[in-house]
């Protein structure tokens, strides 16, 4: 059992860990091809984690912020704009190969923006929500988010409007289709 802040923080930690790994200087030894294969896997993992996380925030977190926080509408709008932009970049990243200049440039931009987005949520939004949310509702929201993550889409879907309700209606199907595509992509790469 964990409340909404604990659940989201765990996700943020995981995303930050993956981004730190991607920024590490390559260690000597491993051959270039192997290194690029690893990098591709790390990016794939980042896309999966980030897609699931933002999808469940859209479905459950932002509606709660809008509902409970006095300036919630504005806070949510700003954050969702950042999330949408990130989805377009991630969607493009799927088609590029690591090592290619364009890929590395897009990834670098994504990482900067993602850190900014995470800081915005943790520093601007969470403190406001903490002031007004009851412990019961925080737990309930955490549980819902954890459950929804199991079926959430693992790809960014930038063309789907970031509205709550869509995930409830289409999420399990989109999530399942994404997982099949992830598997196929993983197999063809070996
Ligand atoms: Fe977010
Ligand atoms: Fe987040």
Q: Across the structure, where does each feature detected by a protein language model lie?
A:
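Small-residue-biased structural context
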Residues: 1-190
């Amino acid at each position: 059992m964990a409340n909404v802040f604990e659940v989201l923080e765990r996700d943020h930690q995981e995303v930050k860990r993956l981004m730190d790994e991607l920024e590490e200087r390559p260690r000597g030894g491993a051959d270039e091809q192997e290194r690029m294969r690893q990098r591709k896997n790390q990016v794939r993992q980042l896309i999966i984690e980030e897609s699931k996380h933002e999808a469940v925030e859209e479905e459950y977190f932002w509606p709660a912020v809008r509902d409970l926080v006095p300036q919630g509408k504005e806070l949510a709008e700003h954050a969702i704009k950042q999330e949408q932009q990130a989805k377009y970049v991630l969607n493009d990243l799927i088609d590029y190969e690591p090592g290619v200049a364009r890929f590395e440039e897009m990834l670098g931009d994504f990482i900067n923006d993602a850190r900014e987005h995470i800081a915005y949520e943790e520093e601007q939004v969470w403190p406001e929500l903490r002031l007004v949310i009851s412990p019961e509702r925080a737990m309930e929201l955490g549980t819902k988010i954890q459950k929804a993550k199991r079926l959430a889409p693992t790809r960014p879907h930038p063309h789907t409007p970031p509205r709550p309700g869509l995930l409830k209606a289409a999420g399990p199907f989109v999530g399942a289709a994404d997982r099949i595509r992830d598997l196929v992509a993983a197999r063809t790469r070996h």
